[in-house]
Structure formats: C-alpha cells, structure tokens
Amino acid sequence: MTDYLLLFVGTVLVNNFVLVKFLGLCPFMGVSKKLETAMGMGLATTFVMTLASICAWLIDTWILIPLDLVYLRTLSFILVIAVVVQFTEMVVRKTSPALYRLLGIFLPLITTNCAVLGVALLNINLGHHFLQSALYGFSAAVGFSLVMVLFAAIRERLAVADVPAPFRGNAIALITAGLMSLAFMGFSGLVKL
C-alpha cells in the first residue's frame, strides 16, 4: 500500500509530467488562459490518460509481447490513444455541450499530447504491472491537471495585473511556468523512487 502512495505522490509532485519531464506543454500553454477551460481539459486528460495507460498495458502484455510485435508498440499506443480520445469526445459532447464548445479543437488534440503517449511508454519501460500502470496513468493525469489549474488561476490574475508591456502575454506566462517549476522542485526530496 505504501508503494502505491509513494508512486502517486512521486508522480504528481516530484516527477510532474509538465514541470519536470516537460511533456504536454502545448495544452499547458494553450488551454490555461481561463480556469473553466483548464479544469475541463484537465478532467478530459485525466480520463484519457488513465484509460489509455490501462489499455496500452493490456495491449502490450496480451498482444504485442506474446506475438513478438514489440516494434509496433508506439504505433499501437497511438491508435489506442486516438480511440480513447474519440470515445471521450463523444462522452463530453453528450454530457456537457458547453464544455465541448469551450474545449474546441483542444479535445481532439489530446491525441497528439505527448504526455499521454509518454505515460503509456514509460509504464512499459518502468516495468509496471497492471495496478501500478493504472495508478501511474492516473497520477500523471492528476499532476497534469493540478499544474494546469494552478497555472490558469495565476494567468487569470496576471490578466488583470499591472504587468510591464514587454512581459505581457506569453512572456509572463513562460516566466510564471518557470517559477512554478522551481516551486515544484521543492518536492524533490519528498519521495525517493
């Protein structure tokens, strides 16, 4: 049980996919201008990342390894992610049309989010079993969502703040992301994996 807690805390805070591994920066910068959009994208990414992580582990363990097709791992994981994203898009469209309109083009772009593919590939490289794989995918998604919501809240405050002209827009956003990354470095001694 302690191993699972350490895996969760380590993935969310210490080895955050956005601030430490620099994966998923496109939606991190693109969807974080409004808090509602960031929360919706975080929820959608959490669902996709967790489900894609589980499906990728199952496909790798039950199909690719027994048939000696491990060279198709990346391609098959991309296909799995695309199917999961399409499923998520259909669910969001039916359950929350307003969120579907807010997310716009970013929902299909989860397919190309390198963090989702990175989680699936890292699960295999780290040798996780099924529960660890599911927890790792969920933890990475929670860390992604946490950072995205925090960043969106900060960007909303910066939008109404008196920022010097050269720093307005993406410049202050990148500085803020760097400061967030430094803040998350404070967790580096918390968990040793």
Curated annotation (Swiss-Prot):
TM ranges: 5-25, 47-67, 72-92, 102-122, 134-154, 171-191
In the Enzyme Commission scheme, what number(s) does this protein have?
7.-.-.-
> Where would you say this protein principally sits, based on its record?
membrane
Q: How does it sit in the membrane?
A: Multi-pass membrane protein
Q: Name one Pfam family in it.
A: Rnf-Nqr
Say which family it is in: Belongs to the NqrDE/RnfAE family.
| Role according to the record | Part of a membrane-bound complex that couples electron transfer with translocation of ions across the membrane. Required to maintain the reduced state of SoxR.
Subunit record text: The complex is composed of six subunits: RsxA, RsxB, RsxC, RsxD, RsxE and RsxG.
Q: What is this protein called?
A: Ion-translocating oxidoreductase complex subunit A
